[in-house]
Amino acid sequence: MTTHLLVTGAAGFIGSQYVRTLLGPGGPPDVVVTALDALTYAGNPDNLAAVRGHPRYRFERGDICDAPGRRVMAGQDQVVHLAAESHVDRSLLDASVFVRTNVHGTQTLLDAATRHGVASFVQVSTDEVYGSLEHGSWTEDEPLRPNSPYSASKASGDLLALAHHVSHGLDVRVTRCSNNYGPRQFPEKLIPRFITLLMDGHRVPLYGDGLNVREWLHVDDHVRGIEAVRTRGRAGRVYNIGGGATLSNKELVGLLLEAAGADWGSVEYVEDRKGHDRRYAVDSTRIQRELGFAPAVDLADGLAATVAWYHKHRSWWEPLVPAGSLPA
């Protein structure tokens, strides 16, 4: 039986990887994908070049807040909602676009999905909604304590989605991932920003004392986790998706310096980010036990492959840097 699947944010880093995986070798043969993206600064149609012309694929340009974005909901069986504004530093400069896309846009999609009788809706979110913790790891039952406008907007979207499940009976499943990395990530994010700066012999900025801790998840593993939730997840359930590799930013920079053949003279310590969460780590026991998911990409191997990709694809990232670069 054919499943018509709407993927929002499909031209972005994670969304495009998800679409390419669905329509690539080993992907489900019965899924017809409608890829929706507004093509704002981080949405790149070249990310979807590999699936252009695929018989089970069509692309629609549209804003999830507007009528064209809502109209594509008609005829869809499932939704995987990845469209979002996602850079914390940008949210500190102007939160309004984050509220518009991540809150109002999510609400608009949920209303449309309910109206059109969509069978299931996967809300793709972030571990940043939990806030910061000193030790241990968050389970899905932790209270939400977002500390940035970005994470607050994502938490709001999560709560709206789960409320639609309770109030309207919409099958909603929420995923919350740790920090992602991999090919085609927009070069304002920490790993690609540092890789591209080091490639050109520039110094890289490291916030505060560099001891803020993050858990890293390769994008290939993330999209496998999303697909596990889409196909086997339970309605009204939240699933953490972690990569299992927890490092301080200073430790991560050390690995990137080594990969680039650079030393610590290439690092410039800068004033810490406002409200910078000290530590993130998620407990992924639920998705492992219930859905059989576990990350497969080793951090060292994944970083090496990511560095190699940015070296090989300068023509992809170089035009993007002047348009939207911020300190990582």
UniProtKB/Swiss-Prot annotation:
Summarize where substrate binds, as residue positions: 86, 126, 179, 189-190, 205-207, 214, 249, 272-276
Q: Which InterPro entries match?
A: dTDP_Gluc_deHydtase, NAD(P)-bd_dom, NAD(P)-bd_dom_sf
Name the reaction it catalyses.
Answer: dTDP-alpha-D-glucose = dTDP-4-dehydro-6-deoxy-alpha-D-glucose + H2O
**How cofactor binds (record note)?**
Binds 1 NAD(+) per subunit.
Q: Is Oxidoreductase a UniProt keyword of this protein?
A: no
Q: Which residues form the active site?
A: D127, E128, Y150
- What does the record give as its pathway? Antibiotic biosynthesis; streptomycin biosynthesis
**GO MF annotation, one:** dTDP-glucose 4,6-dehydratase activity
Can you cite a GO biological process for this protein? polysaccharide biosynthetic process
The record's listing under Pfam families reads: GDP_Man_Dehyd
Q: Which domain of life is it from?
A: Bacteria
Job description of the protein: Involved in the biosynthesis of the streptose moiety of streptomycin. Catalyzes the dehydration of dTDP-D-glucose to form dTDP-6-deoxy-D-xylo-4-hexulose via a three-step process involving oxidation, dehydration and reduction.
Family stated for the protein in its record: Belongs to the NAD(P)-dependent epimerase/dehydratase family. dTDP-glucose dehydratase subfamily.
Q: How does it assemble?
A: Homodimer.
The protein, known as: dTDP-glucose 4,6-dehydratase
Per the UniProt record, the lineage of the source organism begins with: Bacteria, Bacillati, Actinomycetota, Actinomycetes, Kitasatosporales
* Gene, per the UniProt record: strE
